[in-house]
Amino acid sequence: MRSSAASDVYKRQTVTRAGFGVAGLSEKTYKTVLNTNMGALYSPSLSAQVVDGACYLINYELDLNSPENANAATNGYLTATISVADEITKGQPVFYNVPDSASLLQNEIPVKNLFSNGDYGVYVDGYLFFFITMDMFKDQKNSYTLYWDRSKEPTTVENIPTYDLFLRVAKVADGTGSAASSIGEVRAFNIKSVLESVNSSEANKGSTKFNLKVNYLNTINEKDSTDLKWSSYTVQFLVEKNS
C-alpha cells in the first residue's frame, strides 16, 4: 500500500536523495535491507548499522542501470550506496479510548506545524512518518500519540472517504535554556494492521482512494485553556484491490 505521494521507482534512472527507511530482512535472500518508498534497498554494510524493525533517516544514491541491479526483481532488493543518518523515535498509535478533543491532556503542548514529504516517504513499510514542529526548550522530552477511533465511520470529503486521526503531544521532561524556540522532530507511527483493514473495507466498497485527516492541536488560549484551536494535515492513499 502506498500514499498517493509515493514515487514511481522507474521514472528516474539515478536517484540521490534523503528518505525514510525501515530495517528488515529480504524475504528472498534474508539479507538486511532498508524498506523505503523506492523499494527495498541493500548495501553490504547495512547489517552493522541498523537494527531489524527500527526506523531511520537515510541518505542514498541509487543507480537503476548498475550491474548490481540487473537482477533486482530476483534478489528482492535494489543495491544502493546508503548512509544512515539518524534513528527515528517511534510514536505511540492508539486505536481505542480516544480522549476528548475539547479538553487538554496533562502537560499537552500545541503543534505549530505538521507535514510529511513525498520524496522521503509518507507511508513506508507500515509506518506513517511526520515532521512535527513545536515551540519547546532544548533537550525537552515529549510523548507523541496518534489516536484513531476505529469505531467511527469515515466522513466523505469531496467524494473521498476520510478518516479522522488526532495527534497529541505532551511534555514528559523539562528542557534547558531560558527561552523556548521552534524545534522540529520526526516521528514514525506503526498503523499497518489498521490501514490494511481500512484498505480492504474501502476496496470492497469500490473506493479508489481514501484520506487520513490528521488533526493536531495548534493553539491554546493563554487566558482560557478550554479555548483550543485545531488544524489538520491530510494524507491520501490509493486503494489496493483485494486479491
Predicted regions and their residues:
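Single conserved hydrophobic/aromatic residue that forms the stacking wall/gate
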Residues: M1-A6, Y10
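Beta-strand/loop nucleic-acid-binding surfaces
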Residues: V33-Q49
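Flexible glycine-rich surface loops and low-complexity tracts that mediate binding to linear polymers
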Residues: A48-A70
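Short acidic/polar inter-strand loop motif in beta-rich domains
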Residues: L62-N75, N215-K229
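Surface-exposed beta-loop interaction hotspot
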Residues: E68-D135
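Short helix-loop boundary/capping segments
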Residues: K112-S181
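Short, solvent-exposed, Trp/other aromatic-anchored flexible loops in extracytoplasmic proteins
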Residues: V172-L217
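Short beta-strand elements
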Residues: K223-S243
